[in-house]
A protein has these predicted regions:
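Conserved beta-strand in the GNAT
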Residues: 34, 40-49, 76, 81
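C-terminal "cap" of GNAT-fold acetyltransferases
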Residues: 64, 109-123, 127-129, 135-162
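A short helix-loop-beta-strand connector motif used in the catalytic cores of GNAT acetyltransferases and
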Residues: 21-34, 50-55, 76
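Conserved GNAT-fold acetyl-CoA-binding loop/helix
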Residues: 1-20, 30-31
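Conserved G/P- and acidic residue-centered "switch" motifs that form tight phosphate/ATP-binding loops
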Residues: 90
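A short, internal acetyl-CoA/4′-phosphopantetheine-binding micro-motif in the GNAT/acyltransferase core
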Residues: 64-65, 80-87, 116
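Conserved GNAT acetyl-CoA-binding A-motif
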Residues: 75, 87, 96, 103-115
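Conserved acyl-donor/pantetheine-binding loop and adjacent beta-alpha core of acyl/acetyltransferases
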Residues: 48-79
Length: 162
């Protein structure tokens, strides 16, 4: 709830539901890919262009200063979630790959994210997809590793370039 600026979970959910239809917030529908099994939502991933982060940061209802998470030349993965009953089936990897493909289609060569070092399984997941750590940083009192998937580097190591 801290990031939403709302006092209760109900208020936070109402705020996110209202803002989901907007195009001037990073968690709007345009930045979300949803994984479904039939009609059931089993996962989702939220990403945005690094060039858009400052525009979104201006909407912070808490008025606090946050360090930039992204760089202008990349697509940034902000959030990834898979329903607990559907974990272990490759949904998270499919969603991350979808963002990488989308980034390439838009002319980007890098995709980045922050992984909480207190949750090593996250770093392991992203490393298995070719992400590498480029730095560590503190964000909201926690330590994160910034991981980057560089398409040119990944493809060159396989013998071809984009």
């Amino acid at each position: 709830m801290a990031i939403s600026g709302q006092a209760t979970l109900a208020d936070a959910l109402a705020r996110y539901e209202q803002d989901f239809t907007r195009t001037d917030v990073y968690f709007g529908y345009e930045n979300v890919i949803v994984a479904r099994k039939g009609t059931l939502v089993v996962g989702c991933i939220l990403s945005f262009k690094g060039t858009d982060e400052d525009r979104y940061a201006a909407l912070d209802s808490q008025g606090g200063e946050f360090p930039r998470e992204s760089d202008d030349d990349e697509i940034y993965i902000d959030s990834l979630a898979v329903d607990p009953d559907h974990r272990g089936g490759g949904i998270a990897k499919q969603l991350v790959r979808a963002v990488i493909e989308q980034a390439a289609a838009q002319g980007f060569t890098k995709v980045s994210l922050l992984a909480d070092v207190a949750k090593p399984h996250l770093g392991k997941l992203y490393r298995s997809l070719g992400f590498v750590e480029v730095k560590r940083m503190r964000y909201l009192n926690d330590e994160y590793e910034k991981l980057v998937f560089d398409m040119v580097q990944a493809n060159t190591s396989q013998g071809y370039a984009i």
